[in-house]
Amino acid sequence: MSNIKNNNDLSKKYDHKICEQQFSLWTTQKELNKKNLKANKNSYSILLPPPNVTGNLHLGHALNGTIQDCLIRFNNLKGLSAYWICGMDHAGIATQTKYEKYLRENKISNKDKSRDEKVADLFEWSQNVGNNIRNQWKNMGFFLDYENEHFTLEKKSNEMVNQVFVKMYNDGLIYRSKTLVNWDIKLQSAISNIEVIKKEVETNLYYIRYYLSNSKDYLLVATTRPETIFVDECLVVNPKDKRYKNYINKFAINPLTNKEIKIIADEYVDIQFGTGVMKCTPAHDFNDYELGKKYKLNIISCFNEDGTTNNYAVGFENLKIADARVKCVEYLEKNNLLEKVEKTISNVGFSERTNAVVEPMMSEQWFVKVSEYSKKVIELQKSSKKIQFFPIKFEKNLINWMTNLNDWCISRQLWWGHQIPVWYKKDSKEIYVGTKPPKNEELYVRDNDVLDTWFSSGLWPITTTDALKSKDALFPTNVLVTGFDIIFFWVFRMMFFSLYLKKEVPFKHCYITGLIRDEHNNKMSKSLGNGVDPNDVIEKYGADALRLFLLSSSSPGEDLCYVEEKVKSCWGFINKLWNSFRYVEMNSSDFNFDEDKTPKNLEDFDKWILNKFNKAYSEFLQQFNKYNFLVSIKKILDFTWDDFCNTYIELSKNRTSNQESKLWVLNYLIKKILILFHPMCPFVTSNLYDNFKFKTKDSILLERLDFKKISNLKESSIEDVLQIINKIRIFNFENKIPNNKVIDIHLEVLNPKLFKISDEVINILNTAKINIVKQDIKSLKPDYVENNYLIFILNKEDLLGSNNEANNIEKIKKEIEFVKSEISRCNGMLSNKSFIEKAPKEKIELEKSKKEKHEMKLKELEKLLSSHK
């Protein structure tokens, strides 16, 4: 027996709120974090994807964090020095726009404030948001090192960002160029290609007449953007298009400026689109821009950075783009230059952050050359040193995306973020790039722009581990858990920087989560109003129930449907675990448990449950190590609920034989179950462990998962006995027979080698209110037919009354119909090509197993039906 003090305040009923208030692990976790941070070997580390300081965490964050917390606890229990690196992201554009919205809503102006004052105000605002996030982490029970928390805009991060920028500039990987970029008019900032979301939009296709110089003849041009005609540089036709062969190298008149523009030929033009004549406006279209460079055309924009027309839109200046389009169309129509208008579907780019239409804009920006390192990432993923993706399909997506990747535009016209470490000399074109200001700083002006937030986020694995003492042990981290939506934004950039700076991968495994959808399989969104606040779920069911639901519903890369009934069911499981623990404790008051001393006189029933546990534990480990949480947790959930609680505990309640072996097994298994479920349900398991009479550690986190397998556990007829009990329970349930009624049965053994009616079999059946009676059964029909025995219920008429034969036959027929429908459903799933191609292997195997069980059940029922005829 342990000398460690127990908490004797365990309430009779499970109350998640009390359980969470009495969580005793904060101190242990704090001490373990200090110890694990200093460890130089047997380390296991995870980097928390830093949440944006823009608001509260949603269910996706809860899923992502719960998976990581589960892995950290699991590996601590395995004896590794598991450490979870945490922090938050300043999230440049997202945070600045959220803050400016807050200012507008509260009628606060910061126009007269300096840049430093604005940054200080936003930093304070972000700290308040950060406090809310921190509280949510704690509400979820996350095993984070709160004393070593990081921020992507902290001093250490800024130093790292500046050092890397300077190094990349000196290595020729960063350059400045005036070029066509994606411009967010709402932000008045450049954004990168992957921050542009393409959406299909119905718009007008305008057919406009471009008259030839000194001629009444004209070419018809189809365009969706008449407001850019002012800066058309030429018309382009395909040299293979016979319709326009005679027009090449002639001149047409710009319908809005009356200036001459040349007609040129290039195979880029799609003969089938519109009229086959294309207007080329290099400053307002990326494809036109490439043609402009090819033919050395002028590249002039008729838009200002705020989305209004400029002086090149002669007669239409200072109009918003949408208004300019209307005015231009009116002018063209009035002057008989508009021939017709058709509806068409266009792929329009929208800002991922502001949802504003993105405009191509000529602008001087900073870029990172990515082609060299994108090739290195592809080469890496083809080598033995590759990062393993779960599921692997996302590795293929990443590689496909990295082929022919454009350079990364890293400058943003914002004030919240890492200011670019570049100074321009006032009286010359000299540029100074450095981690510190130049000498004679007053002669220079610093670049006002900040870096794309993904620059500091891409350095996150290096910044956070370099900031810690045991950086070599923590880098690379073991696994990154992240959503598929930021593979290109973040995962690639971490790989890029790690290969560039460390010449190794930033993490060994990459687990990709799917989306969380509502119970109708709709994506959760504010517009649909179907979002779920994790705080509300925790308030109602507790963090453990939410965590268990999320983990037991998770497969790599698969979407997860939030169903409240399933969370409620998880609460029900935890409640059952609580009651089972109390039963074991109450019955062990006079018992001395020694885990290392397995009783020599274990009964077959004890061996059966220990074998069941060994199998469930082994299968759990096998699947858990592949990140198949849905399958792995189901193994131990089913064991705990069905085998341990509903079978072993229930049948042990009336057991009188061999109490020592029974109590040893009960205590052994309840302890192992608590340890196994701790990574999923830390609050309830730590609370129960604190009250475990025979605990040997101060904390459940100090226990170990390396369970020693108990050998020599051969047992004979227990599965058959339990099958008999199950049949009788079903019989009682279907016929509404009270549980306290004794059922008299006769067992006709068909295979004595496989099934024997021993004293233990009789005792187990007796505990289930089943009495074995020997009787001549020649004139009787069996109620249940099994492979090894027949079951005859002898007191059926007393229990049901007469005339029940027809009812029994009808019930069997209904059950046959149900089983056939289930077999048909399984066949449908297994013949579905999409399911076979996309579903995890474990799900397919599970469906095959279900089908096999249903087919066996059908044979059994058909045999039973024939015996009643």
UniProtKB/Swiss-Prot annotation:
InterPro entries: aa-tRNA-synth_I_CS (IPR001412), aa-tRNA-synth_Ia (IPR002300), Anticodon_Ia_Val (IPR033705), M/V/L/I-tRNA-synth_anticd-bd (IPR013155), Rossmann-like_a/b/a_fold (IPR014729), tRNA-bd_arm (IPR010978), tRNAsynth_Ia_anticodon-bd (IPR009080), Val-tRNA_synth_C_sf (IPR037118). A motif ('KMSKS' region) lies at residues 523-527. Residues 797-869 form a coiled coil. Disulfide bonds: none annotated. Its EC number is 6.1.1.9. Its main location: cytoplasm. Keywords: Aminoacyl-tRNA synthetase, ATP-binding, Coiled coil, Cytoplasm, Ligase, Nucleotide-binding, Protein biosynthesis. The keyword Glycoprotein does not apply. One of its GO terms (biological process) is valyl-tRNA aminoacylation. GO terms for molecular function: aminoacyl-tRNA deacylase activity; ATP binding; valine-tRNA ligase activity. Belongs to the class-I aminoacyl-tRNA synthetase family. ValS type 1 subfamily. Catalyzes the attachment of valine to tRNA(Val). As ValRS can inadvertently accommodate and process structurally similar amino acids such as threonine, to avoid such errors, it has a 'posttransfer' editing activity that hydrolyzes mischarged Thr-tRNA(Val) in a tRNA-dependent manner. ValRS has two distinct active sites: one for aminoacylation and one for editing. The misactivated threonine is translocated from the active site to the editing site. HAMAP family: Val_tRNA_synth_type1 (MF_02004). PANTHER family: VALINE--TRNA LIGASE, CHLOROPLASTIC_MITOCHONDRIAL 2, VALYL-TRNA SYNTHETASES. This is Valine--tRNA ligase. The gene is valS.
